[in-house]
């Protein structure tokens, strides 16, 4: 597993812990603004992990495909993901 994937995995594990904490906050009847702030933090961690995975994809999968002469498929995949990100 390369460094980007290791970092993405750690970010996802952190987000999972944050989400578990958010669930507990809701169950405990905690203040809504505090819950909302934690949701933003978990969301940011998920976005970070996605960026790391896309970085890994560009640095390895897309580069390898381009060297083998079929990089346009991989580029189209990345454009599809970026379109989803920008539409939100």
Task: List the model feature ranges, each with a label.
Residues 1-88:
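Solvent-exposed interaction patches of small proteins and small membrane subunits
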